[in-house]
């Protein structure tokens, strides 16, 4: 296959580190058994890898002993499990940022049709590229928030949202706060230890540089969601009710040990750098992004869509070329220059 210059990292990061491929191959060949369903050595090994990967996520987000990590097949399923598990009966007003992915908006829309709550967008500044925190505080004063949902990083513009500040404002009204961190975790430092954020969603295959098939969410233990999916858990099997303690009740079915092993290897690799400098990857990405922006600005007919303050910007750049549809530009870059 011809060499490809891959830039589609907002969709999925590629290629992964060689250690990820090796770990997945090893898991597939050596211990791809059903974790938690047996006392034999291979099942224990699979369970250990799952437990260690949870611990890595907790270490990355500084949530040891204060939160739980739930694994799902993707960030999309994590959003669905959270929204499906919320008690909507008394929820009237939901605020979302204008930057939300359809993993949030379509799953939220399902419940809006059922329960009839109001969805309101968080206010933007005059240029329409960043949130206006003062306007948002007035929004909350006028219409009390019951739930606030935000992306940590926009998958379209690369804008890093002020999630902590807005979450703190929302907590003045006892709102539940959900953050979609699919484009952020592993790239943008985040501490959830004393955070006003209640649920933080992550995707294994994006900024964590793991494989497809593994995502999840981190939640503070004070919240118990209703169970949306039921099935086997490997424990208390005579009880037809789903377990209520810990994360097991949110993870029915056989865990994807091969994908989890890949995520485990990726986290191990990335945390080697992050322990020394929490901004290591973000700084490198910003340096490359600034170079890309400078070069694109030199091209006649290119329009860039950027936050005003580039310190609030991760490595995603949106642009148009005058006289071309975006799809046409993508096709030309692919066919003529092998740029994905």
Annotate each predicted stretch with a short phrase.
Residues 1-340:
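Pyridoxal 5′-phosphate
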């Amino acid at each position: 296959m011809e060499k490809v210059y891959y830039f589609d990292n907002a969709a999925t990061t590629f290629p992964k580190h060689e250690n990820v491929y090796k770990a997945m191959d090893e898991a597939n060949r050596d211990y791809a058994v059903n974790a938690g369903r047996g006392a034999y050595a291979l099942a224990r090994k699979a369970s250990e890898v799952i437990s260690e990967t949870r611990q890595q996520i907790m270490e990355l987000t500084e949530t040891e002993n204060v939160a739980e990590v739930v694994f799902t097949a993707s960030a999309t399923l994590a959003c669905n499990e959270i929204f499906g598990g919320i008690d909507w009966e008394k929820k009237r007003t939901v605020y979302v940022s204008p930057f939300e992915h359809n993993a949030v908006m379509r799953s939220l829309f399902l419940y809006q049709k059922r329960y009839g709550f109001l969805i309101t967008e968080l206010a933007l500044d005059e240029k329409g590229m960043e949130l206006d925190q003062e306007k948002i505080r007035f929004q909350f004063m006028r219409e009390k928030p019951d739930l606030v949902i935000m992306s940590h990083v926009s998958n379209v513009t690369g804008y890093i949202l002020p999630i902590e500040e807005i979450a703190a404002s929302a907590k003045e009204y006892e709102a539940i706060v959900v953050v979609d961190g699919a484009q952020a975790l592993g790239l943008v430092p985040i501490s959830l230890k004393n955070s006003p954020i209640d649920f933080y969603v992550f995707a294994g295959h994006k900024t964590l540089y793991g494989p497809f098939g593994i995502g999840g969410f981190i939640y503070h233990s004070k919240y118990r969601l209703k169970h949306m999916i039921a099935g086997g858990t490997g424990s208390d099997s005579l009880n037809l009710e789903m377990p209520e303690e810990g994360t097991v009740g949110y993870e029915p079915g056989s865990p994807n040990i091969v994908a989890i092993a890949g995520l485990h290897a990726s986290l191990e690799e990335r945390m080697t750098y992050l322990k020394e400098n929490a901004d290591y990857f973000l700084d490198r990405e910003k340096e490359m992004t600034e170079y890309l922006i400078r070069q694109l600005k030199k091209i006649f007919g290119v329009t860039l869509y950027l936050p005003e303050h580039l310190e609030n910007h991760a490595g995603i750049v949106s642009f148009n070329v005058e006289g071309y549809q975006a799809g046409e530009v993508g096709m030309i870059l692919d066919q003529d220059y092998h740029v994905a």
